[in-house]
Amino acid sequence: MTQYFDEQPTVPSDRRIVVWALPDGPLTITTDRGVFGHGTVDAGTKLLLLKAPTPPQPGALLDLGCGTGAIALTMARRAPASTVWAIDINARARDLCRANAQRNEIDNVTVAHPDEVPDTLRFAAIWSNPPIRVGKDALHDLLLRWLPRLRPAAQAHLVVQKHLGADSLQRWLIDHDLPTERIATGAGFRVLRACPADHSPAGHDS
């Protein structure tokens, strides 16, 4: 089966629309096969968006592994003076995220392949429902690539399913100079808040 972390999904398209009522207004999302969250907004994403604090603004924000864009669009709506970078290696996901931003009339989202993000860009916040099923080594590489790019005192909020290793991931982050605490639990998921130590090289945030 084609996985949602493939660059070019080969599974036939089957687009479905989801309307999700959030406290700050409804969000209409087109989903598709080959992209995480087909036909639904998953419970982990819901928990993250209900429990994460309002994103800072102005500045650059990051949705790591954007999928259909539910997280990125919510960040953008809550922080209209910020620019949200929605990144994913999956080309179908990027297309959906762009279309969903347009559908919801949200214009402060930049959708990109991870390699298109400027090396000097630093983020005021990162939100992510990371691709746990990509494998432990690949996941660790992903987090070590992006979390150190937070601005000083900035935070990352990650949602991870408990039975897929949320607690062990928290310990691993702490062991890698990424102090992390659990801020919420629900529906079998944990929301983790990571506040990396200030060792990032200088960069810009817009």
Residue ranges of each PLM-predicted region?
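Conserved SAM/SAH cofactor-binding pocket of Class I
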Residues: 43-128
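A short glycine-rich, Lys/Arg-flanked "PGG" loop and its adjoining helix->strand segment in the class I
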Residues: 140-152
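N-terminal auxiliary segments of SAM/dcSAM-dependent transferases
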Residues: 1-22, 34, 38
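Glycine-rich phosphate-binding "P-loop"
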Residues: 125-137
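Conserved class I S-adenosyl-L-methionine
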Residues: 161-176
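General small-molecule cofactor/ligand-binding pocket signal
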Residues: 30, 110-112, 181-183
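Core SAM-dependent methyltransferase catalytic element
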Residues: 185-206
